Amino acid sequence: ESVKFWAKEYHIDGFRFDLMGIHDIDTMNQLREELLKIDPTIFVYGEGWVAADSPLPFEQRAVKENVRKMKGIAVFNDEFRDGLKGSTFDEQEPGYASGNINGHFEPVKYGIVGGTQHPQVDYSGLLYCDGPYAAAPSQMINFVSCHDGYTLVDKLKLSVQGEHSEEELVPIDKLIHTVLLTSQGIPFIRGGEEIMQDKQGEPNSYKSSDAVNQIDWALKAKNRDIFNYIRTLIALRKKHPAFRIPTAEGLEKWLHFLDTGDSGVIAYTLGEYANGDEWKEILVAYNGNRNQADINIPEQDWIIVCHNGQIDLDSQEHLSGGDISIAASSALILYRQ
């Protein structure tokens, strides 16, 4: 009744449930059905876990493992979060994008396919679960930081190994957002993340002052390069439906991972004008290593959209394929017409 009131009287168009797992599946489904009657575009999502134990039997809990039973409801993808940036529970552990490839390869791929079933993902290599739990990519929210825990830049300061300045974290930050905004599913960005906002190293800032929690708008000028980079990634995603495939069947048909050997690079193609895209084939590759990596890609007349930390949707720079090098902590996005 409360949710219906907020939707009708205040026209709230999205509801996020903290610790959604303490609710039962039937209640969440009833809530979703009632909201559909008011406005079918209302978005419902939540944390697909509980803080401790619950008297509800596991099969009745509205947790991520049961999200297939909750059509039209999405959950946060903690596999992708911790695979990409490093453990939320160990502040010093780096993730895939910070050079910690082993143990984080498959969780990142899991996010790329929106938490759905895909024949090229090894689900035994995941961090917290042993299989796909989303029926469709729209049930999966990929993210790396939110109000809980460290901001992304604070986490990187703590976990990236070796001496480094904040400026030296920019390539890793760009790589993380490239993976986030080119993966299937729903991308989630914490406010301020796009300008490298920190919280002065405070992981639990609900009790902190505005000096810690407010957005420092001067960072938009200081970090204009990464702001523009992320803005262009968003434009790429909005323009190209290949990055927004709606079904698991479509992902299995159009998204294919490339064999990159032991390079540590994750690479895949989106082919056959995926999901009605104007580009015939798109190739995306991520190098999480802290050094250059070499891979082999199909020999085609590719046009370079993103490389070496730069992105240009109107680029006319060509690449013929074959053996190529990808700069440390960077992504490569190509397409052919």
Predicted regions and their residues:
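Conserved alpha/beta catalytic core and glycan-binding cleft of carbohydrate-active enzymes
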Residues: R32-E34, I38-M196, N204-Y206, D262, ...
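Non-transmembrane alpha-helical segments in soluble domains
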Residues: V3-A7, R32, I141-V144, H177-L181, ...
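The substrate-binding groove and active-site-proximal loops of carbohydrate-active enzymes
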Residues: I12-H23, K157-E168, Q214-K220
